[in-house]
Amino acid sequence: MSKIIPNSLIYFIYGFSFLGFSQNSSPIYLNPNASVENRVNDLMDRMTLEEKVYQMNQFVGLDHMRQAEKDLTEEELHSNDSQGFYKGLFSDDVAEMTRRGEIGSFLHVLTAEESNLLQELAAQSRLKIPLLIGIDAIHGNALVSGTTVYPSPITLASTWTDSFLEVIGTQTAKEMRATGSHWTFTPNIDVLRDPRWGRVGETFGEDHFLVGNLGAAMIRGLQQEDFTGTDKVIACAKHMIAGGEPINGLNAAPMDVSLRTLREVHLKPYKQAIDAGVYSIMAAHNELNGIPCHMNTWLMTDLFRNKWNFEGFFVSDWMDIERIDDLHNVASNLKEASLFAVRAGMDMHMHGPKFPEAIIALVEEGVLPLERVNEACEKILTAKFKLGLFENRKVDLNAIKDKIFTSEHQKVALEAAQKGIVLLKNQGLLPLKTTKTKKRILVTGPNANNQTILGDWHSAQPNENVITILEGLKKVGNQKGYEVDFFDSGENIRKINDNAISKAAQMASDFDYVVVVVGDNAMRYRWKDKTAGENMGRAALDLPGKQLALVKAIKATGTPVIIVLVNHRPISEPWLNDQIPAILEAWGPGSFGGQAVAQIIFGDVNPSGKLPLTVARDVGQLRMIYNHKPSAYFHKYALNKSTPLYPFGYGLSYTNFEYSKPKLSKFVLNSDEIVSVSVSVTNTGNYDGDEVVQMYIRDKVSSVTRPVKELKGYQRIFLKKGETKKVDFKINKETLAFYDINMEYCIEPGEFKIMTGSSSDDNDLQSIILEVEKRIEVDD
């Protein structure tokens, strides 16, 4: 019969053992003046096998568990994956495990108070090792209430501005550390190849060059060199690999891609992330060519760690080590699945019990080398020492308000929204001019007056911290002489009814303009309303529900209509482009999205966003990407157009830009030389504005087929009306390199078409020829 030891006795035993330990010697690992390497080695020498393995294991937060225990039935608890419930294990049990030092990391810890409590529990363990607390701070620390919610990643990608990502990363890190988190599961550097996938909004789009640059910038901002200090965090590149190309558009579906496609597309952003110093990488839910990514030795060990010198640690995605057994069926039980994962290079398990006992048994049986556990534990401990957690495990609750949602952070969030919103169409309707005679605007649509503008990966934020589109239009519109009214057509996109549509149309007849805010819903805390976001793949790309019927009814009144899209995957609705005079793609514009939209509609801000993906006319056109192969459209669709609705890199302005033909500093590239490409851009319109100048290349003849164009450079510039600026791009051997017929990375001799312009559309580009005379070998 077992006896329960009172907590007071546990505290006494732990306290006495540590007191005696510290009296005998001053441990090096507790000395902040010792080097990180020496502290790690000293601590490792003192740890048992069990304690090392515990550092490799993660649990969800206690409050998260308690909410599940409170809200769900027992049957739901055992079946609801998203709640992270552990069968037979409750929040009080997890708290006690933390006190015993049996947990190394937590996620879903959403308050500083809980973070401090967990760290206090961990401080009572034998070695007092602090916890590494991770969170999905995808675009700001938005799962924590009161923080700055920056535009969603797809909106940030639409700025085509690396510096925004770096600044936002730095600011996000400060808000994370202020609220008790140290590790963010971002950036998502999946290269989007199928927009049916629900997670489009958390990616940087379809081009590996743009994705890689923006991801590396975010990593630099979050980690700020080597993440040493108390205002920096660990970044996590995810999802390794090819998660953006599921065979059926659904999250976690198999990925079946060639080695060439892996090398040319999906792996490139990871190489950039590793070069940027990323310290953690998350494996993908999916299998890759028959092998679950969580047990892929070639990816984790052979390529990333041994060839590319990745120095950080790998973490599993949500319960995916278990899925090696119970979903992929390539292991007979969790113990075998754990062996396959850790032996392949996996360092941390997300999340829950049973993994530690499996790893401990495997080591004791001699099946898994102790060195593999030591390697994983050392990397995790290194992170904790560099982050300063041994000296600063808790946060100052009184200091939080001065570190989150600051005026500086708000300014950046607004500017990113202003520059990430894309003007898709404008037949002279926008901007709406200041009027002396009162004009009336009706605002309606399911996304007009709620927090859908915050995108995915956010919790409900204080209303005073969010400017909805209705609120923005009212504030700016009133200043311009407009009366702005609202009709609530219903917030649930799935349930817009005919009665609401009829009433909206009746009201529209009495107004001068109607702004209809449609799209989809990615708010994860309103699961039954969602139409986009994680695990929300769709078989169509049209406006879900009766939103198009709402727009058509209003358009039929004859009142001019402005469409604002708030969405987290591209919307394929050719009717809108054919019939509506003005369309704004706002994506998820963040805390100040409503203000940014209003400033663009009324002309205080000139739109300058560019699409980081291709928008197809219909789901039947998929896969539709700008960098397709030459034979992709050799034949055409029988009854439909073969062109996109909007091309990659596209975005309008209230002004016009005229491009010169590109010029080269020399016409032949030799091995280690750099060739400059210059183009002059003139603002020929009536407004000052930003333009994103783009450079593409095409290898005219090659030993294997190459894309019809590849993005290789971009620059955002500001031009006053009438002003001309020269933009320079650099071309070196890395710019032109590819994998030849023998999968050797090189440049083959021949001609390269260098293109510059305002989008990837051929009509927007001008070109010049660069020659390479001899084969050039390039390191990959």
Where are the language model's segments positioned?
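Bacterial Sec-dependent N-terminal signal peptides
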Residues: 1-26
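Glycoside hydrolase catalytic-domain context in secreted enzymes
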Residues: 20-737, 749-756, 760-762
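Flexible, membrane-facing loop/turn or short amphipathic-helix motifs
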Residues: 740-742
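Surface-exposed, short loops/turns at beta-strand junctions within beta-sandwich domains
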Residues: 745-747
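Short beta-strand elements
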Residues: 763-780
